From Swiss-Prot:
Originating species: Rattus norvegicus
Pfam family membership, one: Filament_head
Lineage of producing organism: Eukaryota, Metazoa, Chordata, Craniata, Vertebrata
Region Coil 2B, residue ranges: 295-411
GO MF annotation terms: cytoskeletal protein binding; identical protein binding; structural constituent of cytoskeleton
Recorded family membership: Belongs to the intermediate filament family.
UniProt-recorded name of the protein: Desmin
The keyword Nucleotide-binding is assigned to this record: no
Function summary: Muscle-specific type III intermediate filament essential for proper muscular structure and function. Plays a crucial role in maintaining the structure of sarcomeres, inter-connecting the Z-disks and forming the myofibrils, linking them not only to the sarcolemmal cytoskeleton, but also to the nucleus and mitochondria, thus providing strength for the muscle fiber during activity. In adult striated muscle they form a fibrous network connecting myofibrils to each other and to the plasma membrane from the periphery of the Z-line structures.
Modified residues (Phosphothreonine): T17, T76, T77
Region of interest: Linker 2: 287-294
Subunit annotation: Homomer. Interacts with DST. Interacts with MTM1. Interacts with EPPK1; interaction is dependent of higher-order structure of intermediate filament. Interacts with CRYAB. Interacts with NEB (via nebulin repeats 160-164). Interacts (via rod region) with NEBL (via nebulin repeats 1-5). Interacts with PKP1. Interacts with FLII.
GO cellular component terms attached to this protein's record: cardiac myofibril; cell tip; cell-cell junction; contractile muscle fiber; cytoplasm; cytoskeleton; fascia adherens; gap junction
Length: 469
């Protein structure tokens, strides 16, 4: 950026005249003053005050004497002073002129190098200002990109996701309630089915008992019919016997009538037989009526019992058919409820799978958006750091430029001072004793205080202290 040269080979005229300047060095390729960088680039930081003390030693003669600046060497160069009316020492003037020309040549070279360095600094400052403007435009562009829009989109998407999650949660809760209701209905139907099965078993048991009663009644009826037949046979037999007896009695009566006719003194047997017949007929009629009444009562009882059993059997069969129809309807309803439950469970699993996939997709979108936001924040922070670093560099360069400007102004004033002194010099011849007595050294200490705040020069103060040696 600037040409480097060794400080041991070249010594600045400023150093040779004013001594070492505190805080900076002109011998380095990029001679920049050493400033504390703390506080630059930080908004609201405390102001920093930089003080520089320049020691200027000037050798002044008597009235109208030649004043030369003090060199940084151990010895002090004392220029001879010429009084009025004395002879001019041309060899000394020639030496002074040669030294002045050499000094001017070195100063010209150093000023050219300083100009080159300042040109490079100006180019660098211009380049940094361009970069600073580009970064400022980039920062403004990033600020104008509406970062809140991303937050709004994020919040809107989050609200939509929350709404969908709430809808799915409500649907799942409703499906759970329906499933619980179906499970309760299924349990109730199962309990009712068990009750109906128990009732059917009781009806079947009653039917079996009724069947046993019917069988017993049938057997009793058959027995009674058999007994009726036997009684009818017995009645027929008794009738036959009775008829035989009647015939026998009639035959006997006829024989007795014959004997009566033969013997009128014998008792009347016809009346006795008639009485006996009447008695037997009465007894037979009574037995027949009693047998018929008993048979009729037994037949009516058996008929009533059979009718009751038939009614009970018919009612049991009807109830069994109703129970069978109810069982079939309940079985169909249970199958339908099982199918509905299976479809609801399948829908619930599908909803859960879809909800899980959508939730994972939303989580991926959220992670991607958060990663983009983090990336944008990191990029913005990086641009801000670069902008801050460039701003710090610019402030430091502004301070260095201001310092070099002050140094150049001081150097120009120092260069112009010997020319004016040399032009106003009255050459006169003096003796070495007079020159030695008139030469005295005047030391000037310049204290310059520069106060900067946030990289800008706020105030400057310069104090000079004169000391005669």
């Amino acid at each position: 950026m600037s040409q480097a040269y060794s400080s041991s080979q070249r010594v600045s005229s400023y150093r040779r005249t004013f001594g070492g300047a505190p805080g900076f060095s002109l011998g380095s390729p990029l001679s920049s003053p050493v400033f504390p960088r703390a506080g630059f680039g930080t908004k609201g930081s405390s102001s920093s005050v930089t003080s520089r003390v320049y020691q200027v030693s000037r050798t002044s003669g008597g009235a109208g004497g030649l004043g030369s600046l003090r060199a940084s060497r151990l010895g002090t160069t004392r220029a001879p002073s010429y009084g009025a009316g004395e002879l001019l020492d041309f060899s000394l003037a020639d030496a002074v002129n040669q030294e002045f020309l050499a000094t001017r040549t070195n100063e010209k070279v150093e000023l050219q190098e300083l100009n080159d360095r300042f040109a490079n600094y100006f180019e660098k400052v211009r380049f940094l200002e361009q970069q600073n403007a580009a970064l400022a435009a980039e920062v403004n562009r990033l600020k104008g990109r509406e970062p809140t829009r991303v937050a709004e989109l994020y919040e809107e998407e989050m609200r939509e996701l929350r709404r969908q999650v709430e809808v799915l949660t409500n649907q799942r809760a409703r499906v759970d309630v329906e499933r619980d209701n179906l499970i309760d209905d299924l349990q109730r139907l199962k309990a009712k089915l068990q009750e109906e099965i128990q009732l059917r078993e009781e009806a079947e048991n009653n039917l079996a008992a009724f069947r046993a009663d019917v069988d017993a009644a049938t057997l009793a009826r058959i027995d009674l019919e058999r007994r009726i037949e036997s009684l009818n046979e017995e009645i027929a037999f008794l009738k036959k016997v009775h008829e035989e007896e009647i015939r026998e009695l009639q035959a006997q009566l006829q024989e007795q009538q014959v004997q009566v006719e033969m013997d009128m003194s014998k008792p009347d047997l016809t009346a006795a037989l008639r009485d006996i017949r009447a008695q037997y007929e009465t007894i037979a009629a009574k037995n027949i009526s009693e047998a018929e009444e008993w048979y009729k009562s037994k037949v009516s009882d058996l008929t009533q019992a059979a009718n009751k059993n038939n009614d009970a059997l018919r009612q049991a069969k009807q109830e069994m058919m109703e129970y069978r129809h109810q069982i079939q309807s309940y079985t169909c309803e249970i199958d339908a409820l099982k199918g509905t439950n299976d479809s609801l469970m399948r829908q619930m699993r599908e909803l859960e799978d879809r909800f899980a996939s959508e939730a994972s997709g939303y989580q991926d979108n959220i992670a991607r958006l958060e990663e983009e936001i983090r990336h944008l924040k990191d990029e913005m922070a990086r641009h801000l750091r670069e902008y801050q670093d460039l701003l710090n560099v610019k402030m430091a360069l502004d301070v260095e430029i201001a310092t070099y400007r002050k140094l150049l102004e001081g150097e120009e004033s120092r260069i112009n001072l010997p020319i004016q002194t040399f032009s106003a010099l009255n050459f006169r011849e003096t003796s070495p004793e007079q020159r030695g007595s008139e030469v005295h050294t005047k030391k000037t200490v310049m204290i310059k205080t520069i106060e900067t705040r946030d990289g800008e020069v706020v105030s400057e103060a310069t104090q000079q202290q004169h000391e005669v040696l």
